[in-house]
């Protein structure tokens, strides 16, 4: 199984060299590899352009998007585009940028219908 984890950043105000892979998706990769060893190939992305290039080269079975207030709109646009271009890819999102109220969560998922699953804590 091919998996892409992405914690995307806006690239218009920074150089690519300064986009370090975030610890959060690094931890996810490490955990998944301990559980599934050789059954999964995981790639990590910070730059949205590199993510899209990788999709066109070899689309993954699963895309995990790390969701924060500073990248929610970027995730929305990239996720919608990916689902349109690569409908077989399952998209999972998660992170602290999710409202506690059930009605807000439902509204979020309706707006983000490209997301198959959203992982919340609590």
What are these regions (language model features)?
Residues 1-4:
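Extreme N-terminal starter segment of soluble prokaryotic enzymes
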Residues 6-10:
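Short loop/turn segments at strand-loop or loop-helix junctions that form parts
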Residues 11, 15, 62-65:
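A near-ubiquitous, low-amplitude feature marking generic local secondary-structure context
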Residues 12-25:
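Glycine- and acidic-residue-enriched helix-capping/strand-helix junction motifs
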Residues 25, 31-32:
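N-terminal cofactor/phosphate-binding cores enriched in small/glycine residues
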Residues 31, 40-122:
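Glycine-rich beta-alpha loop elements in corrinoid/cobalamin-binding modules
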